[in-house]
């Protein structure tokens, strides 16, 4: 089995990420200013958030954007990690 396949198996779903910080769909919806249906669509993989919403979502969940991207099934291979420039 390829290494990428192994990594994909360990990727948490958006629902798992949300539940890991004890947020309900309604609470996350309220915090982000989006409808509950949108949160559900994201969790079911029916749509993915715009970049600005993805940034807000990552902040609310306390996760890196790369982790969020993986939860949507997006490849982040070759995307550099953020590094402090200060």
Language-model features: locations:
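DNA major-groove recognition helix of helix-turn-helix/homeodomain DNA-binding modules
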Residues: 33, 52-68
């Amino acid at each position: 089995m390829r290494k990428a396949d192994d990594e994909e198996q360990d990727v948490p779903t958006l629902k798992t990420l949300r539940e890991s910080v004890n947020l309900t769909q309604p609470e996350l919806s309220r915090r982000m200013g989006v409808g509950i249906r949108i949160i559900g669509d994201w969790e079911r993989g029916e749509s993915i958030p715009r970049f600005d919403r993805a940034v807000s979502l990552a902040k609310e969940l306390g996760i890196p954007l790369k982790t969020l991207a993986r939860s949507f099934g997006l490849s982040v291979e070759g995307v550099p990690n953020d590094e402090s420039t200060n």
